[in-house]
Amino acid sequence: MIFRAVEDADLIARVKRGDVEAFNVLISHWEKRVYNYLLRLTGNPDDSLDLSQDVFLKAYQNIRKLDDAAKFPSWLFRIAHNEAHSLFRKRKPEVGVDDPDFVERERAHWFSPDLTLAVSAALDRLNADQREAVVLKVYQGFKFEEISEILSCPVSTVKSRLYTAMDLLKNELAPANARGSR
């Protein structure tokens, strides 16, 4: 991870000097993580792909404003967060997973089918703020401070959202896990 941060810092410096190929390499480092993050927020592969393209376009247009290359991951995910929430505002009634079986298919290699359905349903029952905190921490591996930057809220709020969400998930999934392990 440290090597990646050093390499990304070098690429960012090159992009700021006008090296487009360096930005293409930077995209290749981050496109899957950004896409997966957006996919977990939107539940729609097409929207996630479109949003990913918008995220990287905005990142390219604004990378000169990034003062600290070490903050690139949280800066990039902040752009992704903003783009997703902009889409949600435009489509208020449509927010949520369009294909209820999608999450099950994606996680099939991690869980038993029964538990996969239970996890999907439990995540869907979290409010949007809690779900996003879980996605950023559990699925994307961000630290509390980075999530705080991405969501523009205090670290204490991030922790509260995450702990509340995890407690809700634990309580909801305990019966499902007991069924899935039989």
What is each PLM-predicted segment?
Residues 1-3, 16-25, 35-54, 155, ...:
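Short, charged helix-capping/linker segments at alpha-helix termini
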Residues 133-137:
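A short pre-motif secondary-structure segment
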Residues 77, 87-114, 181:
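Short, basic/polar amphipathic helix motif occurring as a linker/hinge flanking DNA-binding modules
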Residues 61-68, 78-97, 164, 170:
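Arg/Lys-rich amphipathic alpha helix in sigma70-family domain 2
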Residues 27-45, 62, 123, 172-175:
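Amphipathic, Lys/Arg- and hydrophobic-enriched alpha-helical face
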Residues 30, 161-168:
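Residues within the DNA-recognition helix of helix-turn-helix
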Residues 36, 50-57, 70-82:
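Structural recognition of an alpha-helix C-terminal capping motif at a helix-to-coil junction
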